[in-house]
């Protein structure tokens, strides 16, 4: 049994492309090897922003010889009245490289037919792999691909070089002028020199020694440790800990080849912002990890993960602090400006937002929601009818705020925050946020009946409206 190592090195690939590409690479390789009737062991993939790697263990070194049966024309068409082979039978035999005298007659469900048995010699795996690997590259699909130079291939980013080793020997693979070799490079800044790959068994160690953590799971663990280390070394606050959001961890893992955490600070004045705003600004825009105290409240700290070791931590931190400060200044301005007008005063302006071309504006939708939610409340909980109608009236008003314009993921959340500022009842403010729940299948659901009733009204309006105009909703996302 043999091993295969295939490395595709590119310019930096967007983080969200990497894991799907690795899954596609593994599935494609397994499918193609099975089609070639080659047995194999584990199929492993590794990826960083600059490389996608396939390793196949225990790969069969040669196809087995096999006998292949080919069924041709019927017996009636294969012999004339004198019992001699017809041109059709002779042509069939020759097309299979067989002497016509070796044709056999076999019984099939459709009757008697001519058949030839072909002895097929198995090919060496090394001879089959070049075409297989080239097809893998050409068939990889990304959310967005690009072309470069005058090549016909499309890929997530331009391919810089390829390495393909089968049992330590270089495979003659060529894709658009890029030839496979046995050389690779380490980290772009920390170990840019070329080095020779020896094989799959040493691949991860070879890269690790050159400041590239190719295994995403190992790199993810390193990100966690680096973020925790950075907080420990800089915070000066007992019990301080980073908020390790799973989605952000996945993203940051695929943004770096060698993670290094840097802890920075921001002005405490920004803590007056709603926690969700601070966290969203750090997480979505800057890919920073927020830091909380032992009581769970946010601290004026954050952690950035760099893609290289840092000699001057204070200089690196100040750069991140400067960028974040600009974001938070904008957020604070939006927050203060938004609160100058009550949500209720914004509702008429929903006329300026199109919900769906054939279904009208968000104001029209809001008015339908008020009627639907009121009907549901009258049927299920009459004592909540007026509160339900109030929630439905205000539910979409925060779409007109600058904060939601900057951070769309905060819709509903900012509605709750601003409703409380406007002295709306707490249960109404809570329901404004909850009416969007669940965001996805299996997600959190409304805890209050108010939120549930308005949420149902919102979805009913969308579903019925879509069916009415002939736009059948799909199951890709909750309506």
Question: Which residue stretches match the model-derived regions?
Answer:
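Amphipathic alpha-helical "coupling" segments that flank catalytic cores
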Residues: 1-479
């Amino acid at each position: 049994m043999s091993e295969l190592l295939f490395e595709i090195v590119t310019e930096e690939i967007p983080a969200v492309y990497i894991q799907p590409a690795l899954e596609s690479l593994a599935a494609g390789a397994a499918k193609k090897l099975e089609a070639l009737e080659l047995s194999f062991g584990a199929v492993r993939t590794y990826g960083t922003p600059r490389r996608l790697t396939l390793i196949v263990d225990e790969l069969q070194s040669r196809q087995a010889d096999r006998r292949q049966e080919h069924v041709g024309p019927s017996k009636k068409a294969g012999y004339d009245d004198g019992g001699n082979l017809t041109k059709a039978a002779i042509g069939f035999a020759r097309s299979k490289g067989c002497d016509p005298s070796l044709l056999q007659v076999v019984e099939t469900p459709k009757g008697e037919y001519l058949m030839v048995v072909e002895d097929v010699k198995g090919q060496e795996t090394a001879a089959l792999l070049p075409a297989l690997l080239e097809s893998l590259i050409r068939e990889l699909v990304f959310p967005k691909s690009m072309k470069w130079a005058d090549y016909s291939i499309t890929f997530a980013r331009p391919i810089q070089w390829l390495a393909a080793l089968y049992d330590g020997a270089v495979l003659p693979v060529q894709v658009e002028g890029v030839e496979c070799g046995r050389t690779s490079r380490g980290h772009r800044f920390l170990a840019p020199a070329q080095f020779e790959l020896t094989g799959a068994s040493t691949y991860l160690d070879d890269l690790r020694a050159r400041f590239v953590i190719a295994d995403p799971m190992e790199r993810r663990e390193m990100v966690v440790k680096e973020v925790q280390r950075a907080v420990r070394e800089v915070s000066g606050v007992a019990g301080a800990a980073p908020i390790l959001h799973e989605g952000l961890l996945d993203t940051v893992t695929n943004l770096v080849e060698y993670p290094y955490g840097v802890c920075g600070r921001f002005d405490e004045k920004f803590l007056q912002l709603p926690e969700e705003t601070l966290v969203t600004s750090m997480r979505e825009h800057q890919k920073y990890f927020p830091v909380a105290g032992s009581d769970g409240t946010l601290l004026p700290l954050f952690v950035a993960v760099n893609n290289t070791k840092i000699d001057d931590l204070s200089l690196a931190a100040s750069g991140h602090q400067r960028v974040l400060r600009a974001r938070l200044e904008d957020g604070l301005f939006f927050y203060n400006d938004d609160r100058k007008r009550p949500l209720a005063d914004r509702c008429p302006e929903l006329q300026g937002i199109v919900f769906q071309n054939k279904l009208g504006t968000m104001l029209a939708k809001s008015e339908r929601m008020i009627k639907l939610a009121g009907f549901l409340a009258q049927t299920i909980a009459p004592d909540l009818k007026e509160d339900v109608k109030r929630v439905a009236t205000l539910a979409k008003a925060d779409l007109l705020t600058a904060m939601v314009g900057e951070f769309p993921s905060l819709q509903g959340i900012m509605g709750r925050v601003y409703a409380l500022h406007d002295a709306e009842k707490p249960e109404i403010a809570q329901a404004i946020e909850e009416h969007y729940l669940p965001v996805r299948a299996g997600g959190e659901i409304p805890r209050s009946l108010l939120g549930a009733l308005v949420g149902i009204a919102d979805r009913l309006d969308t579903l019925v409206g879509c069916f009415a105009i002939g736009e059948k909703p799909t199951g890709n996302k909750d309506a």
